[in-house]
Amino acid sequence: MKKFICILLCVLMCAATVALVACDKKEETLKFGMGVHISASATDATADKEGQGKATINVAVITVDAEGKVVACQIDTADNTVKYTAEGKAVANDGFKTKYELGNDYNMVTYGGAAKEWFEQADAFESVVVGKTLDEIKALVAEGGKGTDAVINAGCTITVTEFVGAIEKAFANLADSNATASSTLKLGMSTEQSTADATEDKNGSNQVATTIVAAAIDAEGKVVAAANDCVQVKFTFDAAGVSTYDATKAAQSKRELGANYGMVAYGNAAKEWFEQADAFNALCVGKTVAEIVALCGADNYGTDEVKTAGCTILVDGFTKAADKLD
């Protein structure tokens, strides 16, 4: 009987030890990063056809483990096209949606003869990326910009060069975070347009500014990692609708511009745009999407909490993009 009791006690102690170890074991935290790949082009207006400026913004947000392998990936593209006439008049858009937001209305199946819609093909590419290193992801691009057999067989037959370009930048922007394998990656983009007609003395413009917010969100709906950026492309044209936009100059996001954005040098700001955007990012961590949206403030310059944190720029772009994380 004593022997049985001793054995039972040993078993119970071992079970308790295993339980304690299991309770103490925490999920591995991952690196988190967002990348933005931009391409822009412009055409002249003619008597028969409006000129147009097109800014294509591919965004990827990733989490990466200690071995440098992607744990999760989310991709979206803002294909912003604006127009102007041969009389130098800027044309206002009804609104802007990303390809993922358009869903079936992007019409790759109906009008393009594709087997799957864009969002389904993007999902397929994301699934291929998971578990791969950056070098392995770069190797997924085949001749002509489309994917390798592994990508095509997964259901992604569109070009993937820009996806990989965005992912490569996301790797370059990786930072330690509280994101884990159970976190959900979300991506939101909000685009605003501003226009000015051309005169004989001054070029007109049709500008699009796309604000991007990415986040890793936990099971309680709280942000555990956040990133943001803004891509502002100003398409210019003369009174005859001839494009004066320099497409040979690579478009850069505000973060990529860094100190060259010039808020301190030319705008007399205390901090550069990216520094103020970082301050807003820091406030997002620990908050729900609704709480982030509430940071906008009545004047769009942020609540007192935002201003005290060191962000004095307009934040309505951030909050509008964040609102799409739900």
PLM feature segments, named:
Residues 15-30:
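Sec-dependent signal peptide cleavage junction
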Residues 26-326:
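Active-site- and interface-proximal helix/loop "cap" or "latch" segments in soluble metabolic
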